[in-house]
Design a protein with these regions (language model features):
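Short, solvent-exposed loop/turn segments enriched in Ser/Thr/Gly
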Residues: 28-34, 98
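Short acidic, flexible loop segments centered on an aromatic residue
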Residues: 43-62, 103
Length: 127
């Protein structure tokens, strides 16, 4: 099997606007996002750390780095999934997020799982 397929974690994001925690009059927009990981490779791998790049509608960037996700460093065997929900706040009604997750395979190989850029948007703003 090709090495690139051996170490492969898919990461998919589903964002959601949280109206009851937001305050548009004070430029506070809160979003939740659920990330679902699936080990589509052939070796077990553990999520070690995360790196998020959050950009608001005025091109202001926040970077967030840390160990694990929501206090966990899950080990995913081939075919297993792990899902978590977290949140962020931006100052505009529309923004974007993209992330990468440092993984360590059972054999010690380090690699990244990447979440492609996704949009944070309040309802009925984007068509």
């Amino acid at each position: 099997m090709a090495e690139s397929k051996k170490y492969q974690i898919e990461a998919r994001a589903v964002p959601q606007f949280i109206a009851d925690q937001s305050d548009p009059a004070n430029e506070r927009y809160v979003f939740a996002y659920t990330i679902r990981f699936e080990n589509v490779g052939t070796v077990p791998a553990q999520l070690i750390s995360r790196h998020w790049v959050i950009t608001d509608g005025k091109a202001r960037v926040q970077e967030v780095r840390g160990l694990g996700v929501v206090g966990q460093q899950p080990l995913l065997k081939p075919g297993e999934t792990f899902e978590y929900t977290s949140g962020c706040q931006i100052d505009t009604p529309v923004g974007t997020m993209r992330g990468s997750f440092q993984m360590t395979a059972e054999d010690g190989t380090q690699f990244e799982a990447v979440t492609g850029e996704f949009t944070l948007s309040i309802p009925r703003v984007l068509h």
